[in-house]
Amino acid sequence: MASVLLLPHQRRKHRQKRARTASYRKPMSQGSSPSPAMEVDGPEFPGKTGGQTIAEMGEERSGAGTGNTGTGGQSSVSGAGGKAGALNTAKLVLSHKPISTSSPEAMAAAQQVTPQKLAQLLLAKGPLAIRFITQALTEEIPSFKDLSASKQRRLIMGALEAGDQENSVVFAKIGWGQWSARHVKPHLFIKERELTNVANSKVKDAGVHEARRSSSNAKKGGKSGSFLNELKRPMLAAPTASIYIDENALASDDDEEDDEEDEHDMLNYENLKRRQPSVVAVEPPELSDQQEVLFRARLRAPNGGSRRRSTSKVRSVSVSKPGAHRAPPAAGDAVEGPLRRLSPSQADRKSTIDIATPEEPPHDELLSANSVAKTRRAAARRDSWLSRSKESSIRSTLLSHSNYNIVSPPSHAQPPADHHPLGREADHSDTDEEDWASIGAPALRNNSMPSNLSSSSSHHGNSASASNAHSEQGSPHARPLNYAIPNSIPPRQHSPPDAEDAAFLLMSLKS
């Protein structure tokens, strides 16, 4: 018997009922009448006997009452019968299985499914689907409904493919699962049946796919037919446009990668070309920029120690020239800019200390293609990593020390006598705080120098005195600031040792 799940409050009621009827549970015969002692009076059991109460309790607990629990009478039997009948019906429904194909009923039902019966059905009721044919045969054949669905379908399809040879009727599939019957000539029955079966197989294979394809296309077309049509047009022209754009992008990237190595050189070379006219400009600049130009000239004049400071002198010459805005340049001043541009590069190749040549080299040699190209490449490489702010800080710090040699760019071309005094007066008028002409090698030698730079100062004093004597013999107007050595002596002989060079660079970094 099936057990019934009870809730907590129902369990409490059952416990109370069991406690009240515990004393009345005694086996009784079915024909005996209930005793007065078994009558239960109270609000819960009004007018009920003990047997009825016990029977009801048995039904609630187990779902079916039995005669052993008491004198159940008709109520217990009827309750048990109702429950059992419902369960039996459910069991029959669940336990229903199609009959075996080898059973006599199945064989009799299969023999009744004939092409003649199907021909009569289809000719009378028109094209029908398989489900409607199955329903009609179920009504006509008693045992046909007990067969399995697959067995029913196989019987129907076999009869349709065989055809009604007696009546010369063939069955054709017209699509959507519907079948129709048509008469043919008796002598052409076999041929028509074969052709019809081949056509039916094709319709079965292609018809379903076409139906699905058409239905899916119709749904898609109804939702976004026009949108898809619009998208097809740009998609056709998209490959050509994308290829064109990609080719341009690749070409431009290749050009950038090819020019990446010489990027700084080209930019700086163009800047130097644009700045070159400012060196030989005839028209003076505005008065508002003169003070700034003079201040930069003062700061850049004493830079002549290391490669880094000599690099800044190239930038100072390219930006401004002291005599370019004070007076119109003479015939020789036009060459002075490029000459000053060449002197620092030669000094960088020969020594770490800026050494200028006292005599003027040939004009053609100075303006040769190799020297100009080397100078511009060297200046462009150094200017790429050197900033003006760093130059200004180094110059302002080095200017306060009197231990370094102050070397100005040499004048390689002497202007005529009538123009030279004007340039000198302008140079003297530029500085109010100190006279640059009075500063020379003797004044620097008299100053106290650190021990690590003593040899360097004596070396510069000797070279400066020699250059001073040579310049006085060559021209009475020679500037005392230009210190150099004769061309007969190679400049590399005057380069300091490695220890002095290292000490000089260390002092410049500390300052």
UniProtKB/Swiss-Prot annotation:
GO process annotations (BP): cellular response to glucose stimulus
Basic residues compositional bias, start-end: 9-20
GO cellular component, one term: cytoplasm
Main subcellular location of this protein, as a coarse class: cytoplasm
Compositional bias ranges of the Polar residues kind: 394-408
Transmembrane segments: none
Subcellular location: Cytoplasm
Alphabetical keyword list: Cytoplasm
Pfam families: Stb3
Biased composition regions of type Low complexity, renumbered to the chain: 446-471
InterPro entries to which the protein is assigned, alphabetical: Stb3 (IPR018818)
Positions with biased composition (Basic and acidic residues): 380-393, 417-429
UniProt feature, compositional bias: Gly residues: 64-82
Family, similarity comment: Belongs to the STB3 family.
The name this protein goes by in its record: Protein STB3
Taxonomic classification: Eukaryota, Fungi, Dikarya, Ascomycota, Saccharomycotina
